[in-house]
Regions:
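C-terminal, loop-rich substrate-recognition/catalytic regions characterized by aromatic stacking residues
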Residues: 44, 306-354, 479-514
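Active-site rim elements
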Residues: 78-80, 161-166, 228-233, 289, ...
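Substrate-access "cap/lid" subdomains that shape
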Residues: 181, 215, 224-338, 367-386
């Protein structure tokens, strides 16, 4: 296939509120990378970024520094891209079909990695080209501050640090303001913005709903694997952690932490934080409830100002549990062997009690998949959907498709992302003979429909009503996509204690990197 490319000194060129930017045109898309939407001093609120000359927006910008250097991990399952890191990371990328006045729906991607890792380009599947080109949408992805740079409460040390515990969230809002003010020049509709994200990115969507400063900046939300109680808010003062850092670094005052080299700051944090965290102290790295962010809606009420915003919320069958299924080769197991494996993992009494419920909820799955049903995501997501359905429209989905890798593996955390972006061609393990093309189109079209209308219904899937407080109307996406109301309610209630205990032995939430 022949590709087309163009990039001249003055085209494609867009004048933004910060200054002019020049991108490039590739295969029918105008692409802009690394556009600064803000700048900020360490621990302080973001301010608008401005420049005088035309900004070259043809390559990705810096990503936020991490507390530990990333290393390749599970690349066959979740292919990664590693990039240059710097604290000047407030930048965004745009893919658009044309620089016109078409007012296309806008999708703003919030990356995963909890609140302490990841970037807008960390995963190969995050690329926005296919979504923009095939879906006729404007796609935006953003970088923002993370970890102690973005979520470290120093409010005890003065008003200038009042919201340091949510500086990363403040960056996201600055990016959404930039989108509101500029996206029309890129062919997008500032009145039709969907924020969507997976894992930590999905959690950031739920956080925005609880943040008054975000009101009016987005109109729909997609939460993918983003409701997980073990990534809870940071409550209490961050003073103890800050004082421990100052002592470790020999810093005279809190202002000195603003200028110490990041590598030294991160090393000191990694040294002092574990003991403080074990003692129940606030060590940052997740949002800090205050007047800016009003807290987890499962612990507090949904804000009435955002209670009617349409949401699409769901999880993946195996999430993190599925990463433990290496070499199982379940395709070669007999039914008796599969049940024996479940008994080995969960104990015979527990397996005997759960398997009938499991087969009723997931008849297409082997009994060997039961230990890999990730209830730590599914159960809080079910609660979130029920609570949200009391106030506004919410649709439930569940990614249920087995993969052929290693003799058959339940879907894992992030395995749905290539389907959402129509990027399975970039992720070899996502290609399932006879399944992927149709499944990818079903999921992709649901996202496109939701971004346009606030309803994921389209002609390629069964009728999909919104959920109610009494009935979770879940669309199970797999080779035989179907609507499954309350399909696993009894199973999750029964399985939660046993599978949670199994996961607790095998999964450390602080290890999340996707």
């Amino acid at each position: 296939m022949a590709h087309t490319f163009s990039c001249s000194a003055d085209a494609p060129l867009v004048r933004t509120t910060g200054g002019s930017v020049r991108g490039y045109r590739f295969d029918g898309l105008d692409i802009f990378k690394g556009i600064p939407y803000a700048k900020a001093r360490r621990f302080h609120a973001p301010e608008p970024a401005v420049w005088d000359s035309v900004l070259d927006a043809t390559s990705y910008g810096y990503v936020c520094p991490l507390l530990e250097m990333p290393k390749p991990n599970g690349e066959m399952l979740v292919p990664h891209r590693y990039w240059l890191m710097d604290e000047a990371c407030q930048n965004l990328n745009i893919w658009t079909p044309a620089l016109d006045d078409a007012h296309r729906p806008v999708l703003v991607w919030l990356h995963g990695g909890g609140y302490f890792a990841g970037s807008s380009i960390e995963q190969i599947a995050y690329e926005g080209e296919n979504m923009a080109r095939l879906g006729d949408r404007v796609v935006v992805s953003i970088n923002h501050r993370l970890n102690i740079l973005g979520y470290f409460d120093l409010s005890d040390f003065g008003a200038e640090y009042a919201n340091s515990g949510n500086a990363g969230g403040d960056d996201i809002i600055a990016a959404l303001r930039w989108v509101r003010d500029n996206i029309a020049a890129f062919g997008g509709d500032p009145g039709n913005v969907t924020v969507f994200g997976q894992s930590g990115g999905g959690a950031k969507v739920t956080t925005l709903l609880q943040t008054p400063a975000a009101d009016g900046l987005f109109h729909k939300g997609i939460v993918m694997s983003g409701v997980l109680g073990r990534l809870a808010d940071c409550t209490g003062s961050g003073r103890d952690c800050a004082e421990a850092l100052m002592a470790e670094l020999g810093a005279a005052d809190i202002a000195a932490l603003e200028t110490v080299p990041y590598a030294a700051l991160a090393a000191a944090y990694n040294k002092v934080a574990p003991a403080l965290k074990a003692a129940g102290k606030n060590t940052g790295c997740t949002p800090h409830p205050n007047a800016f962010y009003l807290g987890d809606p499962l612990e507090n009420a949904f804000r009435p100002e955002t209670a009617r915003i349409p949401l699409l919320v769901g999880t993946v069958f195996g999430e993190f549990a599925a990463f433990n299924g290496f070499g199982l080769n379940k395709a070669q197991m007999s039914a008796a062997e599969a049940e024996g494996f479940a008994e080995k993992m969960l104990g015979k009494q527990t397996a005997d009690a759960l398997l009938p419920l499991f087969h009723a909820a997931y008849p297409e799955h082997s009994a060997a998949d039961l230990p890999f049903l990730d209830v730590l995501f599914r159960e809080p997501t079910m609660r979130y959907i029920r609570r949200r359905a009391e106030t506004g429209p919410v649709w439930s989905y569940f990614f249920n498709q087995d993969f052929t890798i290693e003799g058959g593996r339940a879907p894992w955390h992030c395995s749905d992302i290539p389907f959402v972006f129509h990027n399975t061609e970039l992720v070899p393990s996502a290609n399932i003979s006879g399944v992927t093309p149709q499944l990818e189109q079903q999921i992709f079209d649901a996202v496109l429909a939701f971004a346009r209308t606030g309803n994921p219904q389209h002609s390629g899937i069964p009728t999909w009503p919104a959920s109610t407080p009494q009935q979770e109307n879940t669309m199970l996406f797999d080779s035989a996509t179907r609507l499954a109301p309350n399909h696993d309610k009894a199973l999750i209630a029964a399985a939660l204690p046993a599978i949670s205990a199994l996961m607790a032995r095998n999964f450390d939430p602080d290890s999340i990197q996707h």
